[in-house]
């Protein structure tokens, strides 16, 4: 007893964590779990029953022993209830001991039963658990079916470790996850079918998922039975599922196929349920929202469950289960209170009864009253129960004598599941109101039907505003027969009987109307002919949002909606608008806006040709403030991408926009105002409930909505070709005529359920069919308008010309001809009423297009055949044709020429567009046919002229673009142009001289061949229709006479020459050898070889011969403050002759006003930008307007004299060796120093050392430099840090909008900088590799920026062997040197940027200035110091290696651990970290000696012989 007392006191501490885990297992389907007391009671009871096991520790072995003994007990030895509780609690403790986590007690019992109870090895029952399960703790085999050595097979139970691993995966990732599927497929390869299904059933998981898995397995079994009729060698479903088999029988080889099929079924079921769980409509994801009523939640849930492709029993189970588990907490509590323990088995109707008031104010007050009410006595059942059917306490709704109420129709006597109207979900009775608009309308059935008495019979007729006639299938012969009548509608052309004066009655309204009797009609229709007489109107705005989903739209961030006042309207327009708005309000399309909706959009109206008013809304401001939606449809469908079909039908959706609801929170921004005439009353404000016309998102919302509605229907009909663009629907098929019309009829009925109507008069059945501006025929397609209007010579406005060209461009897919002259005519004045003049060339172009449109016909796409695209040159454009058979184009098109692209590049651009069109319209990659020869295109690709080629291409001999018949090698009447071009005096020049005395020359860069061709091009530009060209270039001469029909153009100059020559009447081309004494040829050669006065830019004007200078133009408006100087850069670069220099002077008109030019000398050969320095001597500000002549450039002859010494007779007081006290002629170096400084802006020390001028003269040069004075740097040096050879600092700096990465070597001051794309780690690591390759650094200092401290950066530094340290950002002590370098770099860069075209070039020039041109105190640059340090390192390393190469030592050897005598000295042959190798002279052997037995000595000195 003492032991027992201690046991009770301790409370089984070794099982503390096990008991804690056991307390999380639920007792049943509710939330009640096991307690610690339950576990202690079970353990104590077991100790009491089995005293021989009491002293043993609670291991898994003991638990299995106790479990075996409990199974041997009979219930009579203890009470049945306590025995069952004891066994169940022990099973839970055993599962927790093994690390398993069953959800319920029942699941725990199943797991233990599977692990022990399924074993059929009865001989091992009495053995210990370790012997029975040798692999319980660590498993070596996972297969229950094992091959015996003696032959045959045996069965072995699934091991607990395997089961535990599967259970863990199921709990962590889910029962239908891919991870669980892979694990199960791995372990279950040789399991029996029974093992597979039992393990799957015992896995933790959602009960609904398990039911779905079971349903999928049943479907697989049914499919097996259908596909495999019973036979002698056919497996049955029972054999596959392991029903009625022992484990030994199921493990035999003849059942391998059955096991594999069973495993395949299970994997398929898991995948199916997993895919279902990922779908948006998955019912298990449908959960009740906090603000949602339980009825709305159930409606969404039932809709999702009904859409699931599962059997009815599974749907029933899902409805019963998910209606409770997915409900909100309040509803679950209410159902628990009302339905008690049977809440899981209660029907959906009972749960709806229980929760119908949840969330209402009364419900909240009821909960509050219950919370404040004192608790009643125990045992008073039913006192607080209340019937939600009659409201009386004491009984539940299902016990109410008044009868249960249906929550669908509201009538008593039946439940919702038995309601007859349930199948007509969404239908309402006549006179009901639509939930979204609350507007009365005739019928809300889908499709809408009403009861009408026709003759003597009552019939249900479909209300169809698109039908002209009323059609019935039978008639009682009342009325007046009018013979046969032919109708054309959705069923094609049909014939019926017409009856007039027929008695028609709707409610109390009776009329005499006309009907058509058509026995074959699938539906009886009430047409427009009788609807108006009966007073029936069908509203097209079906705003029931449960049917048509609304698309969410909203304003842009920060916008408040439009607030534009309504402008005044005339009385006539107000009356027209009132009539329209009243009709819209009656139909529920607009509603009265509340006072707090303050937004407003102006409205107005125009009168149509018919005399009716049309309402227009100015949505421009609202469109600006509204967020855009994605484009639902990126373009029009094209008939060339349609497949040929036997039957086609074109449908048109009536009132498409007005059928779709507008997103309700957005409606407040669509308000508009109806004014009151003369302000006799308050204005009436309305808002839109449907998609309004003119709103920018109406097309996108409409298209997205139709996509949602039609997606399922299209998937169910894969045999048809379906197309939709806005409200136009195309249906094509190869089915029979009746079947095709049946599908069309089905679609009409389907979309009619959503309120969309298809007007009968807009339906087109069969060919020819008009669709989206195209006319479809059985074998071809055309445009609806086959002809273009004619144009005649004479004036035409730009507006009319644009409309004509727009009509042509729309039809280019059948015309395929370019109109360059007409397009050029559209250039110039953009005013719409500006006039152009049509000439004969324009008329000819237009007529060619009109003729092509008449002749061309498009064909349909055949998916069995390949598609080809053939490109060819047109008139200043590229034309291509897409076809599958020669002569039968699908479509054609034109790509107009693009400037600055060669012909080859333009063809490739057109090929890219062609390929894109074909892929979009057919989904295939076309085979491209290019004009010319394959080797030419391959050469273009290799030369880099083009960078893309089609995937599949070949060549054909294209049509001739340029003709050579007007180029001959004979003299033609007309002037002669002597052309020449080439590199003259280091510069490219070209020009020509004519026989009439005209001259032309320009400077231009290029090769000699290019310049020769350019000279011919300029001559062709200026020459008349007939002319002669003389050249000394054999290359240019042969090119002009080449056979251009087969030539693929290789450069743009040749292409331009061909185009110019093509427009000439006749050209004679002649060649003369150069430098052979031909006067005209030598003259043109001399002419372009001269260095002539040339200018670039628009900042200078030509002068008259008598003028002194050339006027310079002010580039922009300049303001000069009083007494200030301003430097103005003008748009001018000038190239002076050798014997010229120039001076910039003041204009007299400016000098009179006190504005002067401060000098300016331009040396001969200067080619930089011209700058003018202006000084304002006035005491007030002066403004120089743009374009004003404000200075003049004066050319001066250059006079140069050689300086000679004064001679011996001349004396000077300043020195004995000539001019200057230094005795050197340094004065000659000052201009050179100034010129060098203007290039690089180096410091005075550098100039002093490089040019040998005095320090003061060098400082004067720097001080007189305006650029250096403006960008003068501060001289304060802030902070410092580690400096040394090969130690660098790095940091980013910004110059304007550019990012520069700057490195500086701390010892020499050498700078390395690169412009980078961003401050990213990847960019920094790329630049690090470049930096390392050039400088081989050893250490680096940076701040803590993310690019520098990234893990990848640290790994790179470690890989390169660079010691990387980081400092503190913004701390001058940490990054002093690189921060100083930033300032130096940017100041120098600012000086050099005007001298370079590219920023990268200016940056490179800055590095030259700072690294090479900048000299230190000892006359060395940073580059000199860096190179010197590297050379010293090399010398030291070489010396060190030589010293370490030969070493000598004394050594001793050991015998049995005892050291011997020292021997030596001798040379070390090899040295390692712990030992050396020497050669023993006595034995002539190589010995390995440990370093502890070695004494190194200096090498012996050589004794010099006397």
From Swiss-Prot:
Cofactor(s) this protein requires: Mg(2+)
Domain Reverse transcriptase: 587-776
Cofactor note: The RT polymerase active site binds 2 magnesium ions.
Gene Ontology biological process: DNA integration; DNA recombination; establishment of integrated proviral latency; nucleotide metabolic process; proteolysis; symbiont entry into host cell; viral genome integration into host DNA; viral translational frameshifting
Domain Integrase catalytic: 1270-1430
Presence of the UniProt keyword tRNA-binding in the record: no
Mapped zinc finger ranges (Integrase-type): 1228-1269
Chain positions of site Cleavage: 363-364
Catalytic activity entry: 3'-end directed exonucleolytic cleavage of viral RNA-DNA hybrid; Endonucleolytic cleavage to 5'-phosphomonoester; dUTP + H2O = dUMP + diphosphate + H(+); DNA(n) + a 2'-deoxyribonucleoside 5'-triphosphate = DNA(n+1) + diphosphate
Sequence positions that bind Mg(2+) 1: 652, 727-728
Binding sites annotated in the UniProt record for Mg(2+) 3: 1291, 1343, 1379
Residues of the Peptidase A2 domain: 459-530
Superkingdom classification of source: Viruses
Catalytic machinery residues: 464 (protease)
Coiled coil: none
Additional free-text comment from the UniProt record: The reverse transcriptase is an error-prone enzyme that lacks a proof-reading function. High mutations rate is a direct consequence of this characteristic. RT also displays frequent template switching leading to high recombination rate. Recombination mostly occurs between homologous regions of the two copackaged RNA genomes. If these two RNA molecules derive from different viral strains, reverse transcription will give rise to highly recombinated proviral DNAs.
Entry protein name: Gag-Pol polyprotein
